[in-house]
Amino acid sequence: RVLFPCFFGSALKMDGIDEFVAGFERYVREPEYDSEFGARIYKVSHDVQGNRLTWLKVTGGEFKAKTMLSGTARVGADLGESKIDDDGMWHEKADQVRVYSGAKFTTVDSVVAGTVCAVTGLTRTFPGAGLGKEPDGVNPVLQPVLTYTLLPGECDIHACLVALRELEDEDPLLHVVWQPHLEEVHLQLMGAVQLEVIQQMMHDRFGLDVSFGPGGILYKETIAHPVEG
């Protein structure tokens, strides 16, 4: 970039709006897209019916509903019944293609390059993943450093695990680990603030009032012999 435009005005008073629109039209270039299909996933969420939504931007070609897609399986993810080949790739069919406007959406048959949409029917996608010609993005620089034990109280621990798996699906910085021999759920995350957010979301979205044990350091390596640091 060699030009950084600066505009002054007020939308409330309709002051400077015409100049802004004219400058926007003059200086902004319309992207040029390839004919080969590509898309970048930037978010995963769930609608009020519990349908899993994969949010993506089409970066090339055309994307149609019912298209068979392939992608790299997320490291450490529970693959369930998804079909995974020898190269660690999943294969699933996209169901609905939705174009949202606020909370409302329109179901469409296809979208072209440059369109942002939400797709149902995909269960193994994750934020940052690429589809088609798009490569996967780099892993987040920040990684969970603390581990906490879930204290379900009077809540069913398996219901808590299902809810936490859904939150893990949406947040790349949350890792949920089920310890079957202990019948415990462990959370790997960034710290107390993220823990408070998760606790509130468990209450608001799932009606589960839970707490957590004291945090511990998540060690990435095991010391093989005594050393001096």
Regions found by a protein language model. Give the residues of each.
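Structural and coupling elements of P-loop NTPases
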Residues: 1-229
